[in-house]
Every structure is written in C-alpha cells, then in structure tokens.
C-alpha cells in the first residue's frame, strides 16, 4: 500500500456506478511541487495498472482525471485533483492507496 501525505480524497458515485475521488490541497508555494509529485505518483499507478484506458468514461474509457492549480495569494497555492473511474478501477485504487 502506498501512503499519501497531501491527498485526502472524498468519494462519490454516479448512477452508472462510476466513482470519483476528489482531493484539494492548499500549501505554501515552496511545497506545491510535493503535492504535484504525489499526484504524478497516483497518475503513474493508474497508467501502469490500466494502460491505454484513460479517456471519457461516457465513451467507454476506464479512468480519467482533472487537475487545477491556482495561486490564491502570494503565500498559498491550491491544487484540486479529481480522478474518476469504473468500479474495477476504483476498487484497485482503494486497495493500492488504502483509501476508504
């Protein structure tokens, strides 16, 4: 199991069974690279575990993500990360990263 320091996910599910994990992290700009590195680790796992499966879930893909980064103030960056997937993808993500 891989431990995440910055990403604390909330989970929701749509009527078709697709799940979405949403996380937001606000840090000093000097630490933003650590948040982005953690996101890169999650995305690398997703791509390695479900290769060539990223895309719009409505079009039959297995997983997709959205990433936004904003500077809220000179001393605060906020990163929002959403990761969506099929039930199999969500189960594997939970198991690998120990998510509830």
Predicted segment positions?
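Long, contiguous N-terminal structural blocks used for assembly/anchoring
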Residues: 1-52, 58-60
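Generic preference for hydrophobic/aromatic residues in regular secondary structure cores
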Residues: 7-12, 23, 63-68, 72-74, ...
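Mixed-charge, glycine-accented linear interaction segment located at domain edges/termini
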Residues: 86, 90-100
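Amphipathic protein-protein interaction modules
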Residues: 37-87
């Amino acid at each position: 199991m891989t431990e995440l320091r910055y990403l604390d996910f909330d989970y929701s599910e749509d009527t078709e069974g697709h799940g979405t994990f949403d996380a937001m992290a606000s840090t000093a700009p000097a630490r933003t690279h650590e948040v982005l590195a953690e996101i890169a680790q999650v995305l690398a796992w997703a791509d390695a575990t479900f290769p060539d499966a990223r895309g719009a879930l409505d079009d039959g893909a297995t997983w997709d993500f959205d990433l936004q980064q904003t500077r809220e103030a000179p001393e605060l960056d906020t990163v929002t990360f959403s990761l969506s997937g099929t039930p199999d993808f969500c189960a594997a993500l939970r198991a690998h990263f120990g998510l509830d």
